[in-house]
């Protein structure tokens, strides 16, 4: 008889829940709920389990916020809860609450070739560290290492490191944004809001007033080639994505590969392929040759957060991935 666990991927707007076959890791019965419609995450879980008439003992839910202890308070939502109390209330034997990029990193060993698009570099080296990052509402970062037959995710808040310009244009962007907001982190330029910041800074650098555009407006105009400022912003976004990925590669020697997740890049995939991304990735001066062979992959799996939550839980329960 198949034994299932509950897995989830929760952001600021939606909660996506599914079942994971504990033996195989296969994800099924995925359903998305609006977080605005429920008073708590526990309430959403109860509705899901009732709707699917399934009894589970174990669960793992990825959430887009730092997980530093038993108390979880979501960054972009009013939900807050005790992991221990929620586990008790649901009658679970195991309940793991992990960072969303911990989940994405744990999905990597489960991905197949059709779930990836490669951008340069050679073949990944088995057993070497892996980096994963992705731009969406914010900039998520994690690393993954393989130790004693176990995958260990190294989560953190790497998206909030300093933005490090490496050209006159990027230095100009930093100067303008720093005058507006003070500290300029990588996330301030590598995210949906970050794309808007790039556009605004480009326009302001020419002593003009920027329009009130949303990220999707900038992307659409750039792809239609109807706005030179938008096209410059998107081009610069791609280059800085490359620089940041190269920084991650240098930091931990990620010869196992660098992986890009998140919802932004797939929206302009062909533009990204032709951009200066890989050039930015390898623009490391004396260490250009060091990163030259490191492959970069774009994850195109529909639900890496659910897949990784399942992988994390299965490993916790003693399965070898």
From Swiss-Prot:
A GO MF label: glucokinase activity
Give me the Gene Ontology terms describing cellular component.
cytosol
This enzyme's EC code(s): 2.7.1.2
Which GO biological process annotations does it have?
Answer: glycolytic process
Q: Which NCBIfam families match?
A: glk, PRK00292.1-1, PRK00292.1-3, PRK12408.1
EC class, as a word, reads transferase
Localization (cell): Cytoplasm
Q: Which family does it belong to?
A: Belongs to the bacterial glucokinase family.
Record-listed ATP binding positions: 8-13
Give the protein's recorded name: Glucokinase
UniProtKB keywords: ATP-binding, Cytoplasm, Glycolysis, Kinase, Nucleotide-binding, Transferase
Alphabetical list of HAMAP family matching this protein: Glucokinase (MF_00524)
Main site of residence?
cytoplasm
